[in-house]
Amino acid sequence: MVPPGNILFLLLLPVATAQMTPGSCSGCGPLSLPLLAGLVAADAVVSLLIVVVVFVCARLRSRPTQEDDKIYINMPGRG
């Protein structure tokens, strides 16, 4: 559940953005198209890298051990 303070912040955020004038950002430079494309491409590469690492780690954990073919009488679920 979201705390009440965060809900109030989210509700007042559009009001605050409507009060700002365009170009009122001090110290903000415009992003060139190659820089923006590079940021998007880098984000996609890092996201794919995270997906691959998670997939490999999950696959390594789900490999059966060598003792899975043994039958244990006193262990339910193994025989």
Swiss-Prot record:
Spans within the Extracellular topological domain: 19-35
Key words of the record: Disulfide bond, Glycoprotein, Membrane, Phosphoprotein, Signal, Transmembrane, Transmembrane helix
Domain of life per record: Eukaryota
Topology class, membrane: Single-pass type I membrane protein
Transmembrane segments: 36-56
Ranges per topology, Cytoplasmic: 57-79
Signal sequence region: 1-18
Gene Ontology, cellular component aspect: cell surface; membrane
Region (PIK3R1 binding site): 72-75
GO MF entries: phosphatidylinositol 3-kinase binding; signaling receptor binding
First-listed, main subcellular location of the protein, grouped into a coarse class: membrane
InterPro entries: HCST
GO biological-process terms attached to the record: positive regulation of phosphatidylinositol 3-kinase/protein kinase B signal transduction; regulation of immune response
Region spans: GRB2 binding site: 72-74
Any one Pfam family match given in the protein's UniProt record, by short name: DAP10
Function comment: Transmembrane adapter protein which associates with KLRK1 to form an activation receptor KLRK1-HCST in lymphoid and myeloid cells; this receptor plays a major role in triggering cytotoxicity against target cells expressing cell surface ligands such as MHC class I chain-related MICA and MICB, and UL16-binding proteins (ULBPs); these ligands are up-regulated by stress conditions and pathological state such as viral infection and tumor transformation. Functions as a docking site for PI3-kinase PIK3R1 and GRB2.
Family that this chain belongs to: Belongs to the DAP10 family.
Protein name: Hematopoietic cell signal transducer
Organism the protein comes from: Bos taurus (Bovine)
Gene: HCST
